[in-house]
């Protein structure tokens, strides 16, 4: 894990060969939905392990079968709220919760409109009460323009003031990171890799395509109303 010097509190895992191997499989257009979902779960899990290194720890007395000694617990691991941005973040959240098994979970449905406005529509928000000792982790695989996460952070912060706000993603574009840090300077960001740029349609380059579609299949879009005149 390394800090990106362009921003405060932004970290990538481009120095981790294992995480880069998982990311390579996710980028490959020949990777099918099953392997893609499994890759997102693995990334969530291993990135969660790394995030625990930034959390407060506490020494505790314990007794082994042979003698008394001292152990360590990751104290902050017990005060985590994971916010899942539907639908692409579901496998990523599954990996995170394997490490943060005490976490309370919130669900947000937010979708980004088409270029050039990229307007964000939020249709569903279920967030638990946030406490002062909490670390709030927002899982969203693709951090492109940053518009979705800015809107989600605006909403989540209404539910209480947390100790930390952390974004976990697979890929991020520099444009999106800059916008998020300008809107929410207190937010830390952990991503597998920071890619080159966005294209005119708001997709990350070189990227990996639409994470939701690749994980769950491309949805049917009825441009002229519901099927069969329903």
Swiss-Prot record:
SUPFAM superfamilies: PRTase-like (SSF53271). 5-phospho-alpha-D-ribose 1-diphosphate binds at residues 87, 112, 140-148, 210. Uracil binds at residues 204, 209-211. It holds the Pfam family UPRTase. Catalyzes the conversion of uracil and 5-phospho-alpha-D-ribose 1-diphosphate (PRPP) to UMP and diphosphate. Keywords: Allosteric enzyme, Glycosyltransferase, GTP-binding, Magnesium, Nucleotide-binding, Transferase. Its cofactor is Mg(2+). It is an enzyme of class 2 (transferase). One of its GO terms (cellular component) is ribose phosphate diphosphokinase complex. Binds 1 Mg(2+) ion per subunit. The magnesium is bound as Mg-PRPP. The keyword Glycosyltransferase applies. InterPro entries: PRibTrfase_dom, PRTase-like, Upp_A, UPRTase/APRTase, Ura_phspho_trans. Pathway: Pyrimidine metabolism; UMP biosynthesis via salvage pathway; UMP from uracil: step 1/1. GO terms for biological process: 5-phosphoribose 1-diphosphate biosynthetic process; purine nucleotide biosynthetic process; UMP salvage; uracil salvage. Allosterically activated by GTP. GTP binds at residues 38-42. Gene3D superfamilies: 3.40.50.2020. This is Uracil phosphoribosyltransferase. GO terms for molecular function: GTP binding; magnesium ion binding; ribose phosphate diphosphokinase activity; uracil phosphoribosyltransferase activity. Belongs to the UPRTase family. Its EC number is 2.4.2.9.
């Amino acid at each position: 894990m390394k800090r990106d010097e362009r921003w405060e509190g932004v970290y990538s895992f481009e120095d981790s060969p294992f995480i880069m191997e998982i990311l390579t499989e996710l980028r490959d257009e020949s990777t099918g939905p099953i392997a893609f979902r499994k890759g997102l779960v693995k990334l969530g899990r291993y990135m969660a392990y790394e995030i625990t290194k930034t959390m407060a720890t506490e020494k505790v007395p314990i007794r082994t079968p042979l003698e008394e000694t001292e152990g360590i617990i990751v104290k902050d691991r017990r005060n985590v709220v994971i916010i899942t941005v539907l639908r692409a973040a579901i496998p990523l959240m599954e990996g995170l919760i394997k490490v943060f098994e005490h976490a309370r979970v919130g669900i947000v449905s937010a979708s980004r409109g088409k270029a050039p406005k990229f307007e964000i529509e939020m249709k569903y928000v279920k967030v638990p009460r946030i406490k002062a000792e909490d670390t709030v982790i927002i899982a969203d695989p693709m951090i492109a323009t940053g518009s979705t996460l800015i809107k989600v952070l605006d909403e989540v912060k209404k539910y209480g003031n947390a100790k930390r706000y952390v974004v976990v993603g697979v890929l991020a574009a520099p444009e999106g990171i800059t916008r998020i840090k300008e809107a929410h300077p207190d937010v830390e960001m952990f991503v597998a890799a920071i890619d080159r740029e966005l294209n005119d349609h708001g997709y990350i380059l070189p990227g990996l395509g639409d994470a939701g579609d690749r994980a769950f299949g491309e949805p049917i879009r009825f441009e002229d109303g519901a099927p069969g005149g329903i």
